[in-house]
């Protein structure tokens, strides 16, 4: 294994490294947080350190790591302490969301409050604690994991199943009889807070109360991990394709359109994108704790200034951006609120824009409903449409990523079949990371690799743990969902393989999923079509047999940013209805099928939305389609050709030819990988 957070010389100006002690294997693999690097300028900025590898000391820590994904934590004392604090503050029900104050999907360990109080470590879920009950709500991806991790104090709410209440409904029901509900206002959006408050009152509750001190933090006490404070670095024009000055100009045009005085930027990836900066405060996501305020004539970045080197400071100054401490944000929003209140009654009220994902606390600090408009972030919309530099970077990095995966799958088959090696899921994932690290501009993983054999593949977000995971069974389906961060792009790919002889049922299931992937990949649709409208294309072949999967079909992907990026996606979420796909979007196409206790199948490619030529243009609209950039073949022995149409076979042949062409030169002298690639891409 060679696991590191590497900073190629073409990506950074200067780097120095240090290796901390991780508490578990998954923490160690989370290179963005747990392998922090000191990014400092050298006397000659052009000279850099290429990469950082783990020391033998780190290997020892990895081997000693605990099995955090299946361990049940006794939460009795934690709940008792929380309930004591609730009583002191006259709170009958306390809500603990998963998010941090920036609405991040992936969070720093210091913000893992829901995991701490409940013991459930999945990325999605909400805990609700009353004075005598506790409930944890999560979606279908995590039913199995939550069932294993929650102790007897907790009731699992399986969100999405018939007759199962949402956490909001459960909370409102429990509030009957005048009970008060409390929440940290930095961890909930105004829209969710307003609706929850209304639902509580409809059920006879006292309403939702903002509790400005986080009660879980008080229970956590000195054991709570410190907030990360890793260095921030500049992403050059070679990778960003657009300067901060231009991005600020475009944002100010949006302020003019909406007649707003300022936009308060609260999403970490939006701050990073706007200022062409990257960090490593959040696991797998190259972001850093920060806010920003952009007015018609100023821009201010709120960040711990000690994280910025001279190059970053100079870049910000050249692009008209000031720097203030991270903790000054709420003080300055209150100044804006007071300025807005001072306008005369005859004037139209001053309006400030915030993202519809911004916190309730931020809206309150800016003056509330009168002075705040919650909007779909104009930065998020702009970020989702990649420029040509970013798109070309995505194409390039996926070729390199594909080379690493092809080499890995050939190696894994050889180890299991020819050498009869006994490899567990983590050992295999370690080797994949090693192969990726050998590629140019590799920085780290984009999420924890899902290396899963047999029944583990049916756990949609399964995470193997060192010393407590399964040995890969060559006679069972193997599902590998993985991704990487490169300076020129972010990857996310899933392939499902079989190293022995699959059953007819397994081949049929795999082929139905593959047909759905092809159907969506080849779809042509008018501009203005949303991912909501396209979702059924990927499910249609499963539906014919009464089958389905409990996750979305696709999500947006950042450019050397978050692997899950809004506002676009393909699925049945209401949010996707109002956001049409547009040329320049990059998103995943990943249908699947899962049999609990047996196996999981998922096939995932990343694709660019682009304009396509059609014979006609009804409605004088451009028509759009997809350009897939993932360069990894499908498992030949799992494909039942009898279920494929000739068009689907032609598509596979064209795709395989493209993969072989792009892999030219990558495996010179590597007979094992070359033979594997030729076999898996042989014509149908």
Curated annotation (Swiss-Prot):
<dbReference type="InterPro" id="IPR001131">
    <property type="entry name" value="Peptidase_M24B_aminopep-P_CS"/>
</dbReference>
<dbReference type="InterPro" id="IPR000994">
    <property type="entry name" value="Pept_M24"/>
</dbReference>
<feature type="binding site">
    <location>
        <position position="604"/>
    </location>
    <ligand>
        <name>Mn(2+) 2</name>
    </ligand>
</feature>
<dbReference type="Pfam" id="PF16189">
    <property type="entry name" value="Creatinase_N_2"/>
</dbReference>
<feature type="binding site">
    <location>
        <position position="590"/>
    </location>
    <ligand>
        <name>Mn(2+) 1</name>
    </ligand>
</feature>
<feature type="binding site">
    <location>
        <position position="492"/>
    </location>
    <ligand>
        <name>Mn(2+) 1</name>
    </ligand>
</feature>
<comment type="similarity">
    <text>Belongs to the peptidase M24B family.</text>
</comment>
<keyword id="KW-0464">Manganese</keyword>
<feature type="binding site">
    <location>
        <position position="481"/>
    </location>
    <ligand>
        <name>Mn(2+) 2</name>
    </ligand>
</feature>
<dbReference type="GO" id="GO:0006508">
    <property type="term" value="P:proteolysis"/>
</dbReference>
<dbReference type="InterPro" id="IPR050422">
    <property type="entry name" value="X-Pro_aminopeptidase_P"/>
</dbReference>
<dbReference type="GO" id="GO:0046872">
    <property type="term" value="F:metal ion binding"/>
</dbReference>
<keyword id="KW-0031">Aminopeptidase</keyword>
<dbReference type="Pfam" id="PF16188">
    <property type="entry name" value="Peptidase_M24_C"/>
</dbReference>
<comment type="function">
    <text>Catalyzes the removal of a penultimate prolyl residue from the N-termini of peptides.</text>
</comment>
<keyword id="KW-0482">Metalloprotease</keyword>
<dbReference type="InterPro" id="IPR029149">
    <property type="entry name" value="Creatin/AminoP/Spt16_N"/>
</dbReference>
<dbReference type="InterPro" id="IPR032416">
    <property type="entry name" value="Peptidase_M24_C"/>
</dbReference>
<feature type="binding site">
    <location>
        <position position="492"/>
    </location>
    <ligand>
        <name>Mn(2+) 2</name>
    </ligand>
</feature>
<keyword id="KW-0378">Hydrolase</keyword>
<dbReference type="GO" id="GO:0005737">
    <property type="term" value="C:cytoplasm"/>
</dbReference>
<dbReference type="GO" id="GO:0070006">
    <property type="term" value="F:metalloaminopeptidase activity"/>
</dbReference>
<dbReference type="InterPro" id="IPR000587">
    <property type="entry name" value="Creatinase_N"/>
</dbReference>
<dbReference type="InterPro" id="IPR033740">
    <property type="entry name" value="Pept_M24B"/>
</dbReference>
<protein>
    <recommendedName>
        <fullName>Probable Xaa-Pro aminopeptidase P</fullName>
        <ecNumber>3.4.11.9</ecNumber>
    </recommendedName>
</protein>
<keyword id="KW-0645">Protease</keyword>
<dbReference type="Pfam" id="PF00557">
    <property type="entry name" value="Peptidase_M24"/>
</dbReference>
<dbReference type="Pfam" id="PF01321">
    <property type="entry name" value="Creatinase_N"/>
</dbReference>
<keyword id="KW-0479">Metal-binding</keyword>
<feature type="binding site">
    <location>
        <position position="604"/>
    </location>
    <ligand>
        <name>Mn(2+) 1</name>
    </ligand>
</feature>
<dbReference type="InterPro" id="IPR036005">
    <property type="entry name" value="Creatinase/aminopeptidase-like"/>
</dbReference>
């Amino acid at each position: 294994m060679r696991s590191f957070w590497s900073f190629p010389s073409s990506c950074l100006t200067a780097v120095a490294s240090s290796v901390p002690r991780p508490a578990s294997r998954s923490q160690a693999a989370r290179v963005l947080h747990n392998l922090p690097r000191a990014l400092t300028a050298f006397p000659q900025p052009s000279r850099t350190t290429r990469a950082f590898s783990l020391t033998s000391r780190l290997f020892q820590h990895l081997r000693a790591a605990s099995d955090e994904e299946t361990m049940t934590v006794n939460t009795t004392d934690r709940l008792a302490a929380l309930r004591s604090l609730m009583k002191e503050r006259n709170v009958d029900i306390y809500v603990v969301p998963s998010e941090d104050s920036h609405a991040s999907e992936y969070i720093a360990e210091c913000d893992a409050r829901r995991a701490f109080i409940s013991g459930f470590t999945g990325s999605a879920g909400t805990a609700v604690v009353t004075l005598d009950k506790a409930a944890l709500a999560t979606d279908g991806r995590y039913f199995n994991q939550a069932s294993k991790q929650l102790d007897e104090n907790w009731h699992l709410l399986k969100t999405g199943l018939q007759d199962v209440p949402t956490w909001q409904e459960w909370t409102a029901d429990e509030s009957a009889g005048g009970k008060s509900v409390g929440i940290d206002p930095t961890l909930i959006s105004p829209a969710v807070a307003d609706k929850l408050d209304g639902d509580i009152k409809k059920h006879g509750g006292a309403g939702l109360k903002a509790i400005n001190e986080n009660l879980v933090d008080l229970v956590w006490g000195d054991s709570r991990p410190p907030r990360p404070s890793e260095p921030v670095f500049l992403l050059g024009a070679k990778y960003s394709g657009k300067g901060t000055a231009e991005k600020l100009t475009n944002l100010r045009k949006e302020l003019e359109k909406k007649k707003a005085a300022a936009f308060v930027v609260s999403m970490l990836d939006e701050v990073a994108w706007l200022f062409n900066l990257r960090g490593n405060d959040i696991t797998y996501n190259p972001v850093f704790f920060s806010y920003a305020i952009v007015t018609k004539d100023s821009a201010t970045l709120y960040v711990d200034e000690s994280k910025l080197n001279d190059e970053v400071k100079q870049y910000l100054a050249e692009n008209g951006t000031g720097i203030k401490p991270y903790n000054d944000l709420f003080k300055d929003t209150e100044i804006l609120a007071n300025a807005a209140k001072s306008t005369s009654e005859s004037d139209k009220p001053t309006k400030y824009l915030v993202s519809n994902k911004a916190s309730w606390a931020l809206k309150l600090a800016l003056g509330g409903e009168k002075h705040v408009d919650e909007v779909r972030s104009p930065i998020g919309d702009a970020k989702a449409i990649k420029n040509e530099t970013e798109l070309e970077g995505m194409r390039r990095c996926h070729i390199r990523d594909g080379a690493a995966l092809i080499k890995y799958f050939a190696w894994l088959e050889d180890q299991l079949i020819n050498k009869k090696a006994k490899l567990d899921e983590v050992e295999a994932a370690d080797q994949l990371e090693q192969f990726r690290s050998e590629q140019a501009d590799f920085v780290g993983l984009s999420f924890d690799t899902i290396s899963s054999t047999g029944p583990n593949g049916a756990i949609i977000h399964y995470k193997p743990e060192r010393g407590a995971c399964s040995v890969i069974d060559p006679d069972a389906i193997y599902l590998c969902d993985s991704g990487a961060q490169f300076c020129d792009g972010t990857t996310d790919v899933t392939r499902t393989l079989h190293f022995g002889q699959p059953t007819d049922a397994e081949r049929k299931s795999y082929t139905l999923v593959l047909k759905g992937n092809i159907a969506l990949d080849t779809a042509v649709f008018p501009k203005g079509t949303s991912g909501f409208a396209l979702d059924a294309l990927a499910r249609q072949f499963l539906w014919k047999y009464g089958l389905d999967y409990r996750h979305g079909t696709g999500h947006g992907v950042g450019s050397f940013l978050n692997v899950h990026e809004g506002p676009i996606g393909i699925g049945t979420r209401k949010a996707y209805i109002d956001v049409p796909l547009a040329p320049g979007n990059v998103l995943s196409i990943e249908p699947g099928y899962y049999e609990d206790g047996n196996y999981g199948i998922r096939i995932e490619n990343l694709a660019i939305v682009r304009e396509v030529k059609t014979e006609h243009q009804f409605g004088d609209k451009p028509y759009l389609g997809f350009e897939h950039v993932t360069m990894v073949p499908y498992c030949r022995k799992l494909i039942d050709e009898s279920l494929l149409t000739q068009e689907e076979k032609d598509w596979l042949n064209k795709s395989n030819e493209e993969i072989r062409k792009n892999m030219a030169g990558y495996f010179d002298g590597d007979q094992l990988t070359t033979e594997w690639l030729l076999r898996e891409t042989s014509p149908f």
